[in-house]
Swiss-Prot record:
GO cellular component labels: endoplasmic reticulum membrane
GO molecular function: ubiquitin protein ligase binding
The gene coding this protein: jamp-1
Organism domain of life: Eukaryota
Residue positions with a glycan: 27
Keyword annotations of the record: Endoplasmic reticulum, Glycoprotein, Membrane, Transmembrane, Transmembrane helix, Unfolded protein response
Lineage: Eukaryota, Metazoa, Ecdysozoa, Nematoda, Chromadorea
Membrane topology: Multi-pass membrane protein
Subcellular location: Endoplasmic reticulum membrane
Name listed for the protein in its UniProt record: JNK1/MAPK8-associated membrane protein homolog
Residues exposed to the Cytoplasmic side: 93-108, 188-208, 251-269, 318-326
UniProt main location, coarse: endoplasmic reticulum
Lumenal side: 1-71, 130-166, 291-296
GO-annotated biological processes: ERAD pathway; response to unfolded protein
Function recorded in the entry: Facilitates degradation of misfolded endoplasmic reticulum (ER) proteins through the recruitment of components of the proteasome and endoplasmic reticulum-associated degradation (ERAD) system. Involved in ER stress response.
Organism: Caenorhabditis elegans
Amino acid sequence: MSSLSGHASTIQPSCLGFCGRTVLVGNYSEDVEATTTAAGSTSLSRCGPCSFGYRNNAMSICESCDTPLQPYDWMYLLFIALLPLLLHMQFIRIARKYCRTRYYEVSEYLCVILENVIACVIAVLIYPPRFTFFLNGCSKTDIKEWYPACYNPRIGYTKTMRCTYEVVFPLYSITFIHHLILIGSILVLRSTLYCVLLYKTYNGKPFYAAIVSVPILAVIHAVLSGVVFYTFPYILLIGSLWAMCFHLALEGKRPLKEMIVRIATSPTHLIFLSITMLMLSFGVIAIIAPLDIPYRWSFLCIVPVPFIFYMATIPFSNPTTTMRLS
């Protein structure tokens, strides 16, 4: 491939936009634009979209996306997987007043976790290298690579060359596969749970909300995936801080000692605060992981600071004001 790239670069100009040339083996007289290589049997096609799982390189040749995903890419996929999980859990929490016993509520929580785990596992297994828990992908350098349809080159200001394909393979398409499998899992597992265990004992609003929310998340991904890819750590930070403050504000203004006792003796408080702390840690790790600075992991020490600050400033604040604004 390297010899082919060097040879092609000396006789052909680079393709425009995200277009690339595909390596052809054999006689393709109608599609071949370059001369044959020294081997005499390999040629390059005209400029056009690369195949699924390929992207253009610096020489405008379509190369296979066989580079292992970077840690930041995996954290983005984890963020995408956590969104429906946390959202569906929130739907169950809102419908708690319709639940007769905690047993039914816990059973639906477990069902939601199982649905998302199944969707994540299947989505990862069907992408190359297939049937492994590893993913290969293309290198990414710019937000424009998430929107190739907006950068199709125009020839003579009249003709548009269509070079739309998944430049950021597999981060764009795997999300749609995950959401599609998730809808199937919800329809099968949640329906089975309702028919077998929760028949006439539980409200179906979390089920319908989950079914509607997944397509909405898919539409948001289709439009804002590039923006979310570069900003999701900050979304996590802001979202987890807001959730923590809002949850603690529900307790109102209490003495510090009483507030600590209520939090320490309430499983709901402990679980919710643990989740927000994990999300806050996740956001901090996603920010510092790509940085090449000494002692970067020491920034994790700031994770408990917002909680400590809130508890220390309760005597000087009025949480009920937050509730009225919400």
